[in-house]
Amino acid sequence: MLPRPLLTTTFGLSYRKIPILAIGKDVYCDTSLIIEALEHFFPPSDGWGTIYPPSSIPGWNYRGYARGFASFWTDRPFFRTTTGLIPPSVWASPFGTDRAQLIGHTLDPAKLAAKVPQNLGAFETHLSLLEPTLKDSSKWLMPTEAPSLADISVYYQLKWGMDIARGKGVYNLTGGNVGEDGEDIAQVVFNEERYPGVWAWFNRFEAYISSLPDLQTEITSADTRWKEDIRRMEGEASLGLVPTPAGPNKELDGRRGLVEGVLVSVVPDDTGKGNPTVGTLMHVGVEEISIKPEEKGEVHVVVHFPRVGFVIKGMEGSRL
């Protein structure tokens, strides 16, 4: 929920969704772009891990399939289904008010409660789509020896949906306004008997994740050294865009007024349209754009957005 001073005050961002990624003074928004930036700037060839392990099918690059799977299925229809399992009492809390502002219309707890059975049915439909692949032959969702982006995206959404359906996490989600004593409504749909393939995959993935070392570090709010590090980089060049198969299409983007130096607004194409990020267009690529925010924060950064899932518009008379 808002406020998120790290976004607004520190970086000058009106964009309200998390997570974001900062690599030096370059800030990346949306998980889809964050993943590609991490893979590019911290490649396996330098000893880093990857969520695109080698394919077991010689010569087949599945990366585009995994990216589309995560962006167009897991993050959209499957996500909408799992949010429909949130306990109705949550929508009567300040979190519900916040989400109504994000979505752009009011949320009626009683109407949403009446839709839970419908949403459970949709949840089961998604499990049914996954079951044949995981039951018949595949260890993972893509033909790989280790989990890929496809597995990570589905696992997170499925785990979150199962937890939120029984109220786990809603106390924190609602700022302490709703307790965590809900009924486990998802187990009637997702269980070993109905979907043994998905069930086995789910537990296999959890075992794999548990076997990995915990490399996470935490920075307290009192530690501001990282801000000083960014300030020292303000005079340096931006990292630029993550490489794509084809370079920028300047002729096509020019027809839309998307040329370097103009003022643009950037908003998600689903929710959060009321919080546009306005800034000077720095780079324009096929999959990504970067801007220098008009609103100045504590540190001056270059902000990157993916083009899929976002609407970029030039501001009239904005040529600089």
Residues covered by each model-derived region:
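GST-like fold's C-terminal all-alpha helical module
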Residues: W73-W201
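GST-like domain detector, emphasizing the conserved glutathione-binding G-site
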Residues: M1-P117, L141, E251-L252, L258, ...
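Non-transmembrane alpha-helical segments in soluble domains
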Residues: I35-E39, L127, E131, F202-E206
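Catalytic lobes of large eukaryotic enzymes
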Residues: P196, S238, L252-E260
